[in-house]
Regions:
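GGW-centered surface loops in extracellular recognition modules
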Residues: 17-118, 160, 167
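Fungal secretory targeting signals
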Residues: 1-20
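Extracellular glycan-recognition modules
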Residues: 98-212
C-alpha cells in the first residue's frame, strides 16, 4: 500500500497529542478511519494496542511496540532495549482502526521483483527515521529503493471511484524523481490486471504520470 521516509504513516497524524486522536476527529464528522497506520503514535485517544512489530537480526525474534499510554507516543525505549547489540527491521505495521488492514512487507509484482528472498521487498530499518513527538523519541518508517509494505486483502476501503480521503505526514527532504513513493488505496493484486487503478498520495517530483 505504500512504498520514502514516513515520519508517521496513516490517515492522519500530528505532532502534539490531544485527548481526541486524529481518527476520533474524523469519526465524529462521519468519516471514520478504515486504515490507520502509525509507528510513532496512537491515532485514537483511547488506543493502547499494537502499533508495529520489529524483528531482531541476531535471532529473528519479534516484539510488538505499543504506545507508552493510551493515545500516546510509541514506546521507543522498549524497542531500543529489545534491539540492543543488534539491528531491527519493521516487519508489520498494524492497523489501529480495528479492521485488520495491517501492512506487511510487499511481495513482488508485475513491475518487478523485490531484492529479498522470494522476490519480496526489503523491510525498513526500525531506527532509520528517529523523530520526537512532545519531547518523546519515536521511530518513523524510512523507505529506500527496494523497500515497501502492502495489504492485498484490505477490508472496508473504497472501491472504484468511491469517496475516500488519505493523509500522511512525510519528511519533506526525502524524495526523488523516480517511480514511486505513494501511500493509499491500491489494487488488491500485485500483478498487472490492465489499466492501473490506484488512488494514493504520491510524494516526489516526477510528473510523467498522474501526480498531485
Amino acid at each position: 500500500m505504500f512504498s520514502q521516509y514516513l515520519v508517521t504513516v496513516g490517515l492522519l497524524a500530528v505532532g502534539s497529542l490531544v485527548a481526541a486522536g486524529p481518527c476520533d476527529i474524523y469519526s465524529s464528522a462521519g468519516s471514520p478511519c478504515v486504515a490507520a497506520h502509525s509507528t510513532t503514535r496512537a491515532l485514537y485517544g483511547n488506543y493502547s494496542g499494537s502499533l508495529y512489530q520489529v524483528k531482531r537480526a541476531s535471532d529473528s525474534t519479534t516484539q510488538i511496540i505499543t504506545p507508552l499510554i493510551a493515545g500516546g507516543v510509541a514506546n521507543s525505549p522498549a524497542q531500543d532495549t529489545f534491539c540492543t547489540g543488534t539491528t531491527c527491521t519493521i516487519s508489520i505495521i498494524y492497523d489501529q482502526s480495528g479492521k485488520g488492514n495491517h501492512l506487511t512487507v510487499a511481495p513482488g509484482g508485475s513491475a518487478g521483483k523485490g531484492p529479498a528472498a522470494g522476490g519480496y521487498d526489503n523491510p525498513s530499518s526500525a531506527t532509520a527515521a528517529p523523530v520526537y513527538l512532545g519531547g518523546k523519541k519515536a521511530y518513523g518508517v524510512y523507505i529506500a529503493s527496494g523497500m515497501g509494505y502492502r495489504n492485498n486483502a484490505a477490508v472496508g476501503t473504497a472501491k472504484g471511484d468511491g469517496a475516500q480521503g488519505m493523509y500522511a505526514i512525510l519528511d519533506g527532504t526525502h524524495y526523488n524523481g523516480g517511480c514511486c513513493f505513494d501511500y493509499g488505496n491500491a489494487e488488491t493484486s500485485s500483478t498487472d490486471t490492465g489499466a492501473g487503478h490506484m488512488e494514493a498520495i504520491y510524494f516526489g517530483n516526477c510528473n510523467v504520470w498522474g501526480s498531485g
